[in-house]
Amino acid sequence: MVDEASLLADVDRQLHVVVATFGEPVADALGAIAGSGSRHRARLLLELARHGDHTLAVRGAAAVELLHLGTLVHDDIVDGSPLRRHAPTLHVALGVPVALWTADALYAEALHLADAVTPAGGLALGDALRRIADSQILEALGATTARYWDVVDGKTVSLFDASFALADESAGGALPAPLRDAVRRYGRLFQYVDDLQDIGGETDALGKPTGQDADNQLHTLPAADLVVSADAVRERLRELSGPIVRLASSTEWADHFAGMTQRLLDAAGRVLDRATV
């Protein structure tokens, strides 16, 4: 069996090939952002497809990362963020017009790669892109905390859904059904913790500015929970994390899901520890 590090290196090579097609100066500025990052979605996809076709899985993982990269470029423009993954954001480095068109091109490249997995894989990623756009429109129109999960399901869970779909296509449709729900719930926990880190995280550790949700008058659930108490956040984290572990418990990925869920809880715990000092 090919190890994850080798497959991730293959994913990175595909990303660099796409980045290089932009030429200078875009390739240099974009490469500084594309060459790092946690690769959460790619890692999950590769893990779920470990018994499948590795070539297809690498294509799918690269497609997901390219689409995610495009959304980050757009997000940074909307948020007015100067920093992403410890590097200047693309619109800061080269201006808004270049950043906008580069993100659009990344979406096209992502869809081409996903379609090369299977046509169904291409459709899954296209659906994720539409859901992302719809949720960002909802957020830009001033979604309240009551619509928080609608926004999250669109802008974050959609890409985890696509990761599962591309993994399943790479594995010949053999993934257990409960894992799909586990992945979706993980996506919700992932975004909740990310929003919590925006409130109380550290820029040096995250590689991006914090406090952007408040600066942009976005209404997030972690902010509302923190107004109640840190214990309210802890209770929410338990509600979000418990089903993930239970749904995956009967599969061979039980330990993997338990581990990645615990890492998110640990990250949230560090924020809460600082908030209550």
Question: Language-model segments: what does each one mean?
Answer:
Residues M1-V277:
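All-alpha prenyltransferase/terpene-synthase fold signal
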